[in-house]
Amino acid sequence: MYIQEMNSKFREKLRKSGLSKEMKSLESCDFFAFEEEDNFVVGAAGLGGLFHVSGIQILEKWRGKGLGKKLQSGLINEAKKRNYSFLTVFNDPRNIASEKMHNSLGYKTIFRIHYSKDIVNDVKIIVFKKRGIFIKKILEIFNSKVGMLILGILIKYSRKLFPRMILYSEENIPEPSIMNMITKFEKI
């Protein structure tokens, strides 16, 4: 496993592997933990954005072999070395393997977003320092119907701000249905 800062050379390497095509936000990360075979990237976990959002993508034939946990652990260790206070991740709760992996590494679910009928994400956090506890408390505001309404309005009408905060490019942020977010709300 390797740790790499994002630069144009590595961005091209990600594109050649096809990983950034499947997950555009990888190209926006500040740094990566990645694995390669024959100079070809087969899996990468990246970190970026104001909320230190972690993203992970592994080529299909490499899934189910523990690579995700290895990469995510590498990312967590590097974040600690760099003095990060916390990391967050957006995880589809229906992805059981990802759910188990993130939970086993210490991520805790703060709230769930039902963007639409088909798109659901749990927002998880792992805290390393006091500032991380403060951020967690702020994010817990969204674990209520009123908080979800506020989040829905923010996402819907402030889409241009979100890429900097949560790493995703604007086109990768799901279009929220505020009504769906409220009616399907689940307290965590």
Q: What function would you assign to each model-found segment?
A:
Residues 58, 64-77, 104:
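Conserved acetyl-CoA-binding loop-helix of GNAT-fold acetyltransferases
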Residues 93-111:
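Conserved active-site alpha-helix within GNAT-family acetyltransferase domains
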Residues 23-33, 52:
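A short helix-loop-beta-strand connector motif used in the catalytic cores of GNAT acetyltransferases and
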Residues 79-93:
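Conserved GNAT acetyl-CoA-binding A-motif
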Residues 49-60:
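Conserved acetyl-CoA binding element of GNAT-fold acetyltransferases
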